Amino acid sequence: IALTIDSKFVRYCAVTIVSILENNDPKDIMLHIVSGHLPKEDVLTLSQVAEKYGTSIAFYYIPHEKLQNYEVKWQKQRLSMVVFYRCVLASILPSTISRVIYLDSDTLVLGSLKELWDTNLNQLALAGVQDTVSPNPSYFERLQYAPSYNYINGGVLLLNLAYWRKHNIEQQCIKYYQQYPDRIILNDQD
């Protein structure tokens, strides 16, 4: 399971981790925390939470330069770069990891993640759940795609990292972001 955070979200992430491990078998869970930088005390806090359940966390750090292609929108809205870390998971996580569940670090997991994990991606880049605002026609008009594609919640995803790597999805995200910045209002959600 991959979570992306900065120091402001450590306490929320700790709650997310507890909710994951309380509702799933900890021995089946490997946690991947991706951040720009975390102070040692934050790393220790999250590690101690995981250790209480007999699991561990791998920490990955993304250099600021890796995400410079996205910065125009961040600067306009003063958002943290963390919102785009999920777009680069395929190049950050080890190549031996072919799929990963991505969760926003303020997600409360109330049940098993097994059904999501077992989802057959059939050569798809990702699977997600329909967002509650999906019926809003303006989203589809702005993004210029058919409503039949649905609008998914970007905070709970099953990512096919092997597909992302093979088809250069990370670069496609960057290219789309650079070509159509005015279409992307909800940032990583779009």
Each predicted region: which residue ranges?
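Hydrophobic targeting segments
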Residues: 1-3, 20, 30-33
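Histidine-anchored nucleotide/phosphate-binding helix
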Residues: 10-24
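Short internal beta-strands
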Residues: 29-37, 128-129
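Short alpha-helix within the catalytic core of nucleotide-sugar-dependent glycosyltransferases
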Residues: 43-47, 95, 110-122, 170
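Active-site-proximal specificity loops/subdomain of glycosyltransferases
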Residues: 44-91
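Short aromatic/hydrophobic "clamp" motif used to bind/position activated sugar donors
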Residues: 100
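Conserved donor-nucleotide/metal-binding helix-loop-beta segment in metal-dependent transferases, i.e.
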Residues: 107-142
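Catalytic core and acceptor-binding pocket of nucleotide-sugar-dependent glycosyltransferases
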Residues: 127-135, 149-190
